[in-house]
C-alpha cells in the first residue's frame, strides 16, 4: 500500500485531527514526505484541513475521486486486491489480468480502471466503459478446487459482494 493510501486510511479512521508527528512515526517517514503526500491528496480532490499544533483532518472528498490510493485505503482484505493495479485508461482489465496471470501473479490481483477502450462482456461482446461513469475491474483468482465446482464460484462471489464492507459514496465499487 502506498504512503498516500496509508495516510488516507488513517485520516478516515480517526474522526479527529492526526498530528504530522504521529503520521511520521507511524509510517517511518519525514514531515516533508507527509506534507507532500497530503498535498497530492488535496490536488486529487480531498479536503484536508491542516491546523497548526493539531494536525490534519479529512473533512471531505470530491465525489468523483477514485484512484489507487483511495481504493487501497478502503480495502480491508487479507489477499483480495493485493496487489492492486489501477489505470486511468486501459484496453481491458480482463486482458491485463490474464497477462499478469501468465507472468505468475498471485491470486487476489485486482485490476481496476476508470475507462476501458476494449472492454468485453459475456460471450466476448463489447462493453461500454466510458471514463468518469463507473469503475471497471477484474479480480484474478487461482482457485484450488476441482473444475466441476467452478459454476458455484459465481454464487460464492455474489454472496461475498453482498456482505462486503467496502462502500463508496456513489456505490460504484463493491
Predicted regions located by residue number:
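N-terminal lobe of the biotin/lipoate ligase/transferase fold
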Residues: 2-159
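Conserved small/polar residues in nucleotide/adenosyl-binding loops
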Residues: 164-173
